[in-house]
Amino acid sequence: MARRTKEDAAATRNGLIDAAERVFCEKGVSRASLSDIASAAGATRGAIYWHFKDKVDLFNAMMDRVTLPLEEGCAQFSCLASGDPVARLRSVMAFVLGAVASNAQARRVFEIAMYKVEYVEEMAAIRDRHIAASGAFTAQLAKDFALAAEVSPLPVSLSPHEAAVALHALFDGLIQNWILCQGAFDLVKVGASATDAFLSGLGLKWGDGTV
């Protein structure tokens, strides 16, 4: 009986987070009320307060259930710790864009985090999470650009860090525009072509020596 009660409580909690995702996506975080979320979940405000301190706590629980795209990228760099650095850059970009395109829940939460919340006061922790992930991802990109430059020097005017910032901007722009345009283009296909065009523009080679 105790186990069933614990399972029921977990199911209720997850149902409330699911409902919060839908309501936050529809109304934005600031305009969404706990009553809206309770109604969407078929529950009461009391049920929300049983599991969460307030709306911010509920929002944080929603964010904790997913891995942000840049966090996915950092994890993938760790999985591909050796080998051709340019091929690794291509693989990481392709992996993360594919993960975004195929995971509806992560995509919805990322849309909320990008477009439907104000990062002020109690929401500052989420902004800090974005900044930390962004910095770590850029550092990983710069590391591989530096390794690649040892074989084929980058243009004099572009340092490994600057190349990393530029590729990071391309990555962010692709995801943000894809979400904003509601999947109007093939994120994986366009992302792969854009990544290859960017790397080729730097004169970098990968695999069989393709530029």
Predicted feature residues:
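Basic, helix-initiating cap at the start of DNA-binding domains
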Residues: 1-27, 31-43, 57-60
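Hydrophobic/aromatic-rich alpha-helical bundle segments in the mid-to-C-terminal region
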Residues: 4, 106-111, 124-132, 149-197, ...
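An amphipathic alpha-helix signature
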Residues: 17, 60, 90, 94, ...
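Hydrophobic alpha-helical connector segments
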Residues: 61, 75-108, 160, 164-167, ...
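Short secondary-structure transition hinges
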Residues: 94-142, 153
